[in-house]
């Protein structure tokens, strides 16, 4: 059950914050001495997505995940937008070494690396160092987006990328998003059937799944083995009336699992036994709560949803 303060913060983010930009919060670095939480029993592997705590460095995201009680963390090697803080994350860099040191010190594992946008000019060979770095960190999943209007070319490039990534033990899952050229689960299923690669997958995220009017049967009809992991958050009942609004909400005003309008218990029935990445970025909460406290709140709420789904 959410406290009154937490419900107020969630509501504020869902209403006043949904349609206006929020300023970036200034927060102190996370340390292992910040706070002591009671251990949580995780029914599945649960990862802290990079976007959820993008206001701290990748190295501090590892510490945040560890202190909050996550089993895994997501690492953003390549920025998703030009406005976010840039880190040197490919190869043997100081930040990569700091991330490695924190992984070793905490025992947290890397679930996924991001983001690989498949564009018209994408060439698989140019992503070799990205895959090498991901393998170095122990990642098993790569978050991809389909950003090429020529679906045949996108499909060919995706197949080549999967082939290049396979020796590194990496699965490449395209995340269907309403504003991308690969926008639905059904469409990604068609691409998966064409390329027939064992390390190709479909990444389901509730905010995109429901905003693009996907159907549960589209998940069930994916080729066997296509679901490698999933993302979880919650959403407002009110849907933005423009694509820009949908995109802005997805990047800035997601809700904590189980506190919004999405039927996550039903969705989880179609995503059984998968590792979960909590991607619940919320710009308003970032102004009032530390990255660590947000991460812990999201984890507690996610475990509550899993328990409600009969997973303990």
Language-model-detected regions and their locations in the chain:
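Mobile, glycine- and charge-enriched loop segments
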Residues: 30-52, 100, 104-116
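Glycine-rich, proline-tolerant flexible connector loops at the mouths of alpha/beta enzymes
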Residues: 74-98
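Active-site beta-loop-alpha junctions enriched in small/polar residues
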Residues: 49-53, 78-80, 115-118, 146-149, ...
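Alpha-helix N-cap and loop-to-helix initiation/capping positions
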Residues: 87-95, 122-129, 149-156, 183, ...
């Amino acid at each position: 059950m959410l406290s009154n303060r937490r419900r107020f913060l969630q509501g504020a983010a869902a209403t006043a914050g949904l349609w206006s930009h929020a300023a970036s919060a200034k927060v102190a670095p996370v340390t292992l001495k910040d706070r002591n939480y009671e251990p949580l029993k995780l029914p599945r592997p649960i990862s802290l997505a990079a976007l959820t705590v993008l206001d701290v460095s990748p190295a501090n995201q590892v510490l945040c995940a560890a202190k909050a009680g996550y089993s895994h963390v997501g690492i953003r090697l390549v920025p998703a937008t030009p406005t976010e803080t840039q880190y040197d994350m490919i190869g043997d860099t100081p930040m990569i070494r700091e991330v490695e040191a924190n992984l070793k010190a905490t025992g947290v594992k890397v679930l996924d690396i991001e983001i690989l946008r498949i564009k018209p000019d994408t060439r698989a060979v140019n992503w070799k160092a990205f895959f090498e770095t991901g393998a170095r960190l122990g990642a098993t999943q790569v978050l991809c987006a389909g950003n090429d209007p020529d679906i045949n070319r996108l499909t060919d490039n995706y197949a080549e990328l999967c082939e290049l990534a396979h020796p590194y033990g990496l699965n490449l899952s395209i995340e269907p998003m309403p504003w991308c050229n690969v926008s639905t689960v059904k469409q990604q299923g068609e691409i998966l059937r064409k390329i027939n690669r064992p390390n190709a997958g479909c990444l389901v995220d509730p905010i995109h799944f429901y905003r693009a009017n996907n159907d549960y049967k589209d998940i069930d009809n994916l080729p066997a083995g296509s679901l490698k992991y999933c993302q979880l958050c919650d959403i407002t009942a009110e849907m933005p009336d423009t694509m820009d609004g949908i995109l802005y909400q997805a990047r800035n005003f997601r809700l904590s699992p189980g506190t919004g309008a999405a039927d996550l218990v039903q969705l989880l029935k179609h995503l059984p036994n998968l590792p979960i990445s909590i991607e619940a970025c919320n710009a308003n909460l970032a102004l009032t709560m530390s990255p660590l406290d947000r991460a812990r709140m999201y984890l507690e709420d996610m475990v509550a949803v899993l328990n409600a789904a009969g997973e303990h």
